[in-house]
Every structure is written in C-alpha cells, then in structure tokens.
C-alpha cells in the first residue's frame, strides 16, 4: 500500500525562489560584515562549486587566510540551514493546501482505517495499537538551541511568503523582519563553546513538546477516534501514540547520567505538561463565561465552583469560570508539590534549582498564581485521573443542559491530552550495559557472603544462583553494612529514584529498563537482582520490564536461543503477566551495521524478528519490538513508513517503539504540521503492517529468504575483509575522516567511545557513522552490497531477473535497495578522494581505491536491479533538494579538508580550531541525517 508523496510541479520552483531570496538576504548580511571586496571571494567560490570546478575550488580555498576562513565557514554553514527552512515551510504549506482541497489527502490514516474497518477484529486492532517514538539525545543534534529558536522565527516568516506575494501581508515589514533575523543568525555562534550537559539535553528536547508534539499528538489522537467513529467503530480509550524519552535515564556509556538527572528529567517533563494544562485552563476560563441566569448547571458543577477562591462579584453568576479557577489553582499546587515536595523529606530538587526551572517553564501569570496560593494550603491532585474527573464533571454539566457544542474544542482537547500524557508527559527508559549490572551483582553477592567470584561461574551456575535469590529469599542483598563501591552506590541510587518517581508520578513514568549488549539469560536476571534491591521486582510481579538489547550480528543470531531459555522460567512468565503479557525486545541497528555491514545487519535483524515473534507465539506471549534506529541508513534510518511496512508480517502485534534521534527530531517535529504528518505516517504504517500481508505465496517468500541468506553471507565477508582484516583500514578511517575532530565536538553529553579507542570495535556507532557522512563516503550505508549482488548474478545470469522480482514484490528488499540508492546519491567520491589525501602513507591512501571500486560496483548493481538509468529516479523530491543544496555545502568539505591539513601541520592557531567544528555542523545540516 503506497502513501501519497508530498510533491507537485510547483515545489521546486517555489523553493528555488525562496532559497534565492534567503541567499540574497544572507549575501547582504555577509557583505555588510566583511565588505564587497572580501565578499567577491565568496561569490567566486559559489561559482566554482556550481560548475563542479573542483580543482579551482580547491586552489581558491587553500589560498584563503585563517581569518578569511571564518566568514567562509559561517556563510556556507548557514546557507544549508536556510535551505532546510524553505523545504520545511513548503512541506507544511502543502500539507495544509492538500488537506483543504481534499480532506483525505493526508488521509493516509483515513485510508488505513477504511481497510481495517473490513476486518472482523477491527475494534480490537484500533483500540490497542500503540506507536511510541522515543526521543533520544545521541550526539547527532548539532544545532544549538539558540539557532533552533532563530530558525523557528525565520520559518514562521517564510510561511507568510505566499501571502506577501498575494498582497495580504505587508511586504515591507515582512521583508525587514526576515532581513533582521538572517542578520542575527549570521552573527550568532552556531556551535557550542562548551559540551552539553544532560540537563541541557533535557531542556532542549522539551522545546519540541512545547512547539509541536503535545498539540500534534493530541490532535492526531482525536482525529483517529473520529475516523474510526465514521466507520461505526466507537473506541473507548485508544492510545495510538504515546511518547518515550531516553534523556536522563540512558546511562550506557554516559557517566553523567545519575539519579539526579533521572529525577530532573521526570520533573521537567511533568512541569512542561502541567504548564500546558494550565495554559489550556486559562483559555477555557476566558471563553466559558456562561451565566447561571441564562443556563442551568449540574449540582456537581456547583460544588466544584463553590470551592474556588475567586470571590470577585463579577464571577458570582459564572460557575464554569469559578470551576476552572479552582481546577487551575489545584493544578498549580500540584506543580508546586512536585517541584519542592509536600514535605522537606520529599524534595525533588533544591529550591534554587526549582526556581531556575520555574523561570524557564512557568509563564509569568502562572508564577503569580503560584505565589498567591502558596500560603493557602490548597489541595492538590494526587493523580492525573483526579484532574481528569474534575474536567469530566464540567463536560457532563455542559452535555446535560444542551451545551454539547461547547465541549468540542479546548475542553475536549484538554481531556484528550490528560488521557495521553498524564502528569508525566513521556515514559523515561532506563538503560545500562550488561557488564555494569554484572559488576554490581558480583559485589552484592560477595558482600552478602554468598559467592566470592560470581563472574567466574558458568552461565548455568549464574542462572541457578540468581534464580534462587529472586524466588526464595525476599531479603535485599544491599541491606548489609559492608562498604559499597562508588559504582554500586550510583546504580542503587538511580534504581531507588526510579521507584520514588513511579510512586509519585504513576507507573508509566518509567516502564522499561534496557540492557545493552545482552548476551545471556543471566544478563537479564542480574538486572532483576538490582530491581529487587529497591522493590521494583519480586517473585510475583515486575513494576519495570526487563528489555534485552541485541546489537551485534552474533548476539542477534543468538537471540532466539537466549529468549527461548528466558521465557522457559515460570518466574519470568509471572513478570510478563504483570505487563499484560508483553515482552519487549530492543534491536540495535547501529552496532550490527558496524559489525557486519548494511546488508548483513538488515537481514539479520529481519530474521531475528521472525524467529523471536514465533518464540513468543509458542509461549503465548506478545513479543513487541523496540527499533533502535538512527537518522542515517547506516543506523537503520530512512523513510519511516517504508521502514515499518517492510518489517516481517506478524512482527507488529499492536505495539511498536522506535528511537527518534538528533537532527531527525528537528526535521520531523520542528513544527506542528510536520509533526502531525510524520506521526500520522508512523501510525498508518504500523496498522498497515499489522493487517496487510504483502506477499501471499509462502513458497515465494521462502525462496526470497533463501536467496538473501546467500547474498548476505558474501556481503558480510566482503565487509569484514576490509574493516577488520585489512591492516591499513584503521589508520585510513582515523586519518582520512574528521573522526578526531568529531570526537571533540560539543554535540552531546556522551563520550565518543566507552573507552580509549585502539580498534574499530571500540568506537561508538554514532561517531563512526557521523564521520563517514562528513567525508561523504557514507560507507556504512552501502559497502559490501555491490560485491554480494555481483557474486550472486555471476552464479547464474537468471539471478538478475530474480533480484528484480524481489525488488518489485518484496517490501523489505525494496526498502533496503531504495535506502542504498539514497545514500549513494549523497556520497561524493571526488570529495572523498581529497580526504584520502590526508592519510600519511601510500598503503593507507590505497584503501580508498578499494572503497571506490566497491562504490562504483554497488551503484551499477543497484541501478540494474531497480532497472533505472540514474539514482533517485523514484524520489524526485530528494533529487531536486540535492540539486539546489549540494553546490553550497560541498564547499564546506573543501574548507574542512584545508582546515584539517593546517591543524595537522600546526598551521592553525587554537582560536581557529573551532572553524572545523563549524564545517562539521554545516555538512551535517546539509545532509539532514548526520548520524
């Protein structure tokens, strides 16, 4: 089932026009800063890049002084940013335009529900489907919050461009405002002077909730219910969308995530959503001026209104306003209690920290309300359900006395939001590496005199010992007075905080704990021991779900055996039963790709889902998958709709979670229109995959799978032969890419590696992919693909036709190849060659020739299977986008190469080193999916 492409004949023309205008204003701002003579050099560089005169471009840039590099780096970093804004505006405009012409245009969701309505269990499907985008703070979001705020203002202005052309908006004022903000952004630091802290990441991601996500999720849920109702399917409390969060709870490899950051993350989230509720109540208060002299109200509404402290004579006859006043005051008191606790012992954070956050998140008028009522000891809501019940009293009174129309709008949206977000906004995941859990459990067992050297036990001995502790002894191991290591204290503190947050904000604030590098059943039991220490798990129930993360090719291959053993235990079945019979499993796209290459990773993940789904069915358990996808193809990225619908049939029961990372968050959720569209696609894709079997012939799919097994084996061998067996590859990567500079870039709180990097396997997947994007090879998204297909076709010429059939009929294979097509189009081997020249020896530089040959072979094979003459034939929008952006951000690669040369030859003063970071930022912005 295809979905509508957002494209029209006017798109390229209008974007070209807008980009021309934005470039003109940027030219003016730049010229004003440096003068006409210096600006001539920028114009020359633009001309050389536009005509693909790489020799002239290289010579011109190498002749620039370090001081001249400053303005050149800034200019060509900001230009791709402005192009992105134009594309985002055009997307938002077309969403609205097409919706106005045809209500069902974006009606991908409408079409999906039409299909589902024909199923016998339609209501059950629609009632229980749940898609969870999980926002993360991996180091791929390179834009500063300040820059994002400025681009948001430019975005809002550019959205009025068509109205300006039509004479509806004053052109002179609009133009002056646009000129002003572009002038400001040209003089604003685009990179961070200091590395982000976890608390910065928390507040940064909250901007997306305030800007778009809360309203988009609420609106989409209401639309979902309405579309189902049109088909005669009346849903009770569906949650097609809920949100997840890693920031503050993901401590895998990040020593800066602690109990305090987990607490802060939960508190800030709570403040953001309660703030939203208070603002909506203000709207309702202003609008609901019904007089008791002109309409009747229910006794329950009168009781609610009479509790208000609003004693104004002007409100005596306005019970709805008084009711909303009381609800608002009670909600503000709830917020204050959450911030500082209802007693000193329950304080979340210090009063100074609370004051800082209030200043950021609470509007001045709400802060005033808080000040007024703080000494009154007003009641607060214990739960979000209590708050909802008060809102329902208002609704019932309106409906009872014929005011149904007043329920629609703000009140209905507010009730809907409370259903979705509660007082917690998004579920925070916890994550830690399995080795840390093992070290902590080993220490606990030793201090309790149970076993001196737990780590030396066999897997069977470990499981027997841990099972006994979990089922037979209710006591905690940490109750002894033995001294604890700093690591153990830190881990126990974060688990204890998790329990406190669940007690205070509700169970859904934290539902999962993910175990990185899960390699055995004991890895999961070790986490259970830690959870038991703070009362989050016992012999009968689990308040937090244990989620294994299978990352490497080997671990994915072993996942079936591991989960078969794990699900065999009666204790585990009890835990799963307390989670509505769901067992979540996380799949790692990044590490499996770095381990075996793109084809091997994709196919291993596909097979693992098939096998794990069957294991769940055999045990009467619903296996749900959490897809740890990044922005790039090398990390599982690509178009979301195609990515989801290409999963194995049956692998999506009714729930799916997936990570949304870095700059992908800005691209997808930077404004409400884009957020609505992208979230709609996630829901539609998930339901489509649940109910639609793309290939109905089982023999055909078996044949396709057998073919893939052979192809992937060859691809994996070719990939590993270069990455792990070639003695010069390690040096090539570190010398012919900006990995060293990427590692020092202040783009996230997490280190680039878990330890000192001495081999490729020790490098985190994100900087690995990020660096290959910077040098424009895009290596993780295609290497090994061409050789594998060539080898298969050489065995039998008829195999090409078989691959072409697979591309046409199998969504998984089609998505796989389409993604390779896309990354090849973003690569540039002329630029990559210049990076290769940075390598110190001929042997190291020669690695590039191996890569280049595979790149050309992969391109030839992809085009042959797709039966296309050129890349991106099926994606004209991306083709057009690259046409007008590549000439500008290609320049940044040449600037970056020259700066790296100067840095490595000690010709770049410390003051100018940050220019490399500016180019990294600009290239990532131009590519739009850096890591």
From Swiss-Prot:
Belongs to the PEPCase type 1 family. It catalyses: oxaloacetate + phosphate = phosphoenolpyruvate + hydrogencarbonate. Its cofactor is Mg(2+). The lineage of its organism: Bacteria, Bacillati, Bacillota, Bacilli, Lactobacillales. GO terms for molecular function: magnesium ion binding; phosphoenolpyruvate carboxylase activity. NCBIfam families: PRK00009.1. Pfam families: PEPcase. Forms oxaloacetate, a four-carbon dicarboxylic acid source for the tricarboxylic acid cycle. The keyword Lyase applies. GO terms for biological process: carbon fixation; oxaloacetate metabolic process; tricarboxylic acid cycle. GO terms for cellular component: cytosol. Its EC number is 4.1.1.31. This is Phosphoenolpyruvate carboxylase. HAMAP family: PEPcase_type1. The active site is at 138, 594. SUPFAM superfamilies: Phosphoenolpyruvate/pyruvate domain. It comes from Streptococcus agalactiae serotype Ia (strain ATCC 27591 / A909 / CDC SS700). It comes from the Bacteria. Keywords: Carbon dioxide fixation, Lyase, Magnesium.
């Amino acid at each position: 089932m295809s979905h509508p492409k957002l494209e029209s004949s006017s798109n390229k023309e209008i974007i070209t026009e807008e980009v021309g205008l934005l470039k003109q204003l940027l030219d003016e701002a730049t010229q004003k800063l440096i003068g006409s003579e210096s600006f001539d050099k920028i114009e020359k560089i633009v001309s050389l890049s536009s005509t693909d005169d790489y020799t002239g471009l290289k010579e011109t840039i190498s002749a620039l002084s370090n001081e001249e590099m400053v303005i050149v780096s800034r200019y060509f970093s900001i230009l791709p940013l402005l192009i992105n804004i134009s594309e985002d505006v055009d997307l938002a405009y077309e969403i609205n335009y097409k919706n106005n012409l045809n209500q069902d245009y974006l009606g991908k969701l409408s079409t999906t529900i039409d299909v589902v309505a024909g199923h016998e269990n339609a209501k059950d499907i629609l009632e229980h489907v749940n898609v969870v985008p999980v926002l993360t703070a991996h180091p791929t979001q390179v834009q500063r919050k300040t820059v994002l705020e400025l681009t948001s203002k430019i975005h809002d202005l550019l959205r009025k461009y068509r109205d300006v052309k039509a004479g509806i908006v004053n052109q002179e004022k609009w133009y002056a405002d646009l000129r002003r903000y572009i002038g400001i952004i040209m003089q604003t630091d685009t990179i961070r002077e200091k590395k982000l802290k976890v608390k910065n990441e928390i507040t940064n991601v909250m901007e997306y909730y305030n800007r778009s996500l809360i309203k988009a999720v609420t609106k989409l849920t209401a639309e979902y219910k309405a579309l189902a109702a049109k088909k005669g399917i009346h849903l009770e409390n569906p949650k097609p969308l809920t949100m997840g969060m890693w920031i503050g709870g993901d401590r895998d490899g990040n020593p800066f995530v602690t109990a305090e950051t987990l607490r802060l993350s939960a508190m800030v989230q709570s403040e953001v959503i309660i703030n939203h509720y208070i603002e909506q109540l203000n709207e309702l208060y202003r609008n609901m001026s019904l007089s008791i002299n002109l309409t009747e109200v229910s006794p329950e509404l009168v009781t609610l209104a009479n509790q208000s402290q609003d004693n104004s004579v002007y409100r005596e006859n306005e019970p709805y306003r008084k009711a909303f006043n009381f609800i608002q005051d009670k909600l503000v008191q709830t917020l204050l209690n959450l911030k500082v606790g209802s007693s000193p012992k329950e304080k979340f954070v210090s009063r100074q920290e609370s004051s800082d956050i209030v200043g950021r998140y609470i509007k001045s008028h709400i802060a005033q309300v808080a000040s007024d009522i703080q000494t009154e000891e007003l009641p607060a809501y214990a739960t979000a359900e209590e708050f909802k019940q008060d809102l329902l009293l208002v609704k019932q009174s309106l409906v009872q006395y014929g005011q149904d129309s007043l329920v629609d709008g703000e009140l209905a949206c507010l009730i809907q939001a409370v259903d979705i977000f509660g007082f917690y906004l998004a579920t925070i995941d916890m994550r830690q590496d399995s080795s840390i859990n093992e070290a902590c459990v080993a220490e606990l067992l030793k201090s309790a005199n149970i076993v001196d050297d737990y780590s030396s036990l066999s897997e069977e001995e470990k499981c027997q010992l841990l099972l006994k502790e979990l089922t037979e002894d209710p006591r905690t191991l940490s109750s002894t007075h033995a001294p604890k290591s700093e690591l153990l204290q830190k881990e126990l503190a974060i688990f204890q905080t998790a329990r406190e947050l669940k007690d205070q904000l509700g169970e859904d604030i934290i539902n999962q704990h993910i175990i990185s590098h899960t390699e055995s059943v004991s890895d999961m039991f070790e986490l259970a021991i830690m959870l038991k220490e703070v009362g989050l798990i016992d012999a009968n129930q689990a308040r937090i779900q244990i989620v294994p993360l299978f990352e490497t090719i080997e671990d994915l291959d072993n996942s079936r055996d591991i989960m078969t053993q794990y699900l065999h235990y009666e204790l585990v079945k009890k835990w799963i039963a307390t989670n509505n019979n769901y067992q979540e499993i996380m799949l790692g796209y990044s590490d499996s790709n770095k381990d075996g290459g793109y084809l091997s990773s994709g196919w291993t993940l596909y097979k693992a889902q098939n096998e794990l789904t069957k294991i769940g069915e055999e045990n009467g358990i619903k296996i749900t998958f959490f897809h740890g996808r990044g922005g790039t193809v090398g990390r599982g990225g690509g178009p979301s709709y195609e990515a989801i619908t290409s999963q194995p049939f049956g692998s999506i029961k009714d729930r799916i979670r997936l990570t949304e990372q870095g700059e992908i968050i800005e691209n997808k959720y930077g404004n409400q229109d884009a957020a609505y569209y992208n979230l709609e696609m996630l829901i539609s894709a998930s339901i489509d995959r649940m109910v639609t079997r793309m290939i109905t012939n089982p023999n055909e799919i078996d044949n396709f799978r057998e073919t893939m097994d052979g192809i992937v084996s060859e691809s994996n061998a070719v990939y590993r032969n270069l990455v792990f067996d070639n003695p010069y590859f390690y040096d090539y990567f570190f010398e012919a890419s900006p990995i060293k500079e990427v590692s020092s870039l202040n783009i996230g709180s997490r280190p680039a590696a878990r330890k000192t990097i001495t081999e490729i396997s020790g490098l985190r997947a994100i900087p690995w992919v990020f660096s290959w994007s910077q040098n424009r090879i895009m290596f993780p998204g295609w290497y090994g693909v061409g050789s594998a297909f060539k080898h298969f076709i050489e065995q039998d010429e008829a195999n090409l036709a078989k691959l072409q059939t697979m591309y046409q009929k199998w969504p998984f294979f089609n998505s796989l190849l389409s993604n390779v097509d896309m990354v090849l189009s973003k690569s540039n081997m002329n630029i990559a060659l210049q990076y290769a020249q940075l390598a110190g020896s001929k042997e190291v530089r020669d690695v590039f020739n191996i890569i280049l040959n595979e790149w050309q072979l992969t391109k030839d094979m992809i085009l042959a299977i797709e039966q296309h003459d050129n890349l991106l034939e099926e994606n004209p929008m991306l083709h057009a986008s690259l046409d007008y952006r590549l000439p500008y951000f290609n320049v940044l690669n040449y600037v970056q190469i020259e700066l790296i040369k100067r840095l490595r030859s000690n010709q770049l003063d410390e003051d100018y080193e940050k220019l490399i970071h500016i180019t990294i930022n600009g290239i990532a912005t131009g590519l739009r999916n850096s890591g």
